[in-house]
């Protein structure tokens, strides 16, 4: 089994102490095990995760307090990628509505890429706390975008309420898409989230996404860009 001693360090040829890579490997193994168990319809428990990852229960608990914490960390990958994409877009001089459109595309690309894990995660024995972490983090992304478009904001409600409403819409459409594509996924078909992205953008306020009701929605183009950017944290773990 993998060693979980996070405090260990290793010596380099120059005599300096380098961070021990074992904790990162343990964390990566747990992430992979969670994705595989979810995709295989296996029951996701700490015991099952530890066995699949080849680590001890103690190793699991040295990284995560429980399934809630693990699921939150895995979902956080997507948001970290979204924040990074936002910084890159800002540095490149993109407008705020361009950033918003790509934020939705990042969400759709993540769901498309990890649909098996996310579909399985719906059945995890996690608590309401996980849902609150998810919605809170998603809402924070919308808050940052809304703050950067003061001239576009409606007179009411406030930014926080708007962000929660936008988040709720995203989650409803994502959940519906996961359920609607379940049969195709089980048949081994390659899924395409272009329609999901188009629906999310079509139902978002036009003042927020910068597209009028009659304007074409470049969902395929946006999703293609998001796919290449976020071959994302999943490949880093």
What are these regions (language model features)?
Residues 126-152, 157-172, 195:
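Amphipathic alpha-helical packing segments from all-alpha helical-bundle domains
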Residues 119-121, 186:
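Short, hydrophobic secondary-structure boundary micro-motifs
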Residues 25-36, 52, 69-89, 102, ...:
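Alpha-helical structural segments
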Residues 37-69, 73:
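Helix-turn-helix
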Residues 2-11, 143, 147, 179-237:
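C-terminal peripheral helix-coil segments that are non-catalytic and often amphipathic
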Residues 2-43, 48:
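Basic, helix-initiating cap at the start of DNA-binding domains
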Residues 87-116, 127:
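Hydrophobic alpha-helical connector segments
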Residues 37, 77-85, 89, 114, ...:
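A short secondary-structure junction motif
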């Amino acid at each position: 089994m993998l060693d979980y001693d996070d405090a260990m360090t290793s010596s380099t040829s120059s005599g300096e102490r380098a961070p021990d890579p074992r904790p990162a490997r343990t964390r990566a193994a747990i992430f992979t095990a969670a994705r595989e168990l979810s995709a295989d319809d296996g029951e996701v428990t700490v015991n099952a995760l530890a066995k699949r990852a080849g680590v001890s229960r103690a190793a699991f608990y040295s990284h995560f307090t429980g399934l809630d914490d693990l699921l939150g960390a895995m979902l956080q990958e997507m948001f970290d990628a979204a924040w990074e994409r936002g910084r890159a877009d800002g540095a490149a001089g993109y407008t705020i509505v361009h950033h918003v459109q790509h934020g939705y595309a990042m969400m759709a690309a993540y769901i498309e890429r990890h649909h098996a894990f996310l579909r399985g995660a719906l059945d995890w024995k996690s608590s309401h706390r996980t849902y609150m972490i998810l919605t809170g983090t998603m809402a924070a992304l919308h808050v940052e975008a809304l703050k950067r478009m003061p001239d576009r904001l409606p007179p009411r409600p406030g930014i926080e309420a708007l962000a929660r409403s936008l988040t709720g819409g995203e989650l409803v459409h994502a959940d519906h898409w996961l359920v609607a594509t379940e049969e195709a996924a089980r048949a081994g078909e390659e899924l395409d989230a272009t329609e999901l992205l188009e629906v999310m953008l079509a139902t978002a306020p036009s003042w927020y996404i910068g597209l009028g009701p009659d304007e074409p929605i470049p969902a395929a183009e946006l999703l293609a860009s998001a796919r290449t950017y976020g071959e994302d944290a999943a490949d880093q773990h």
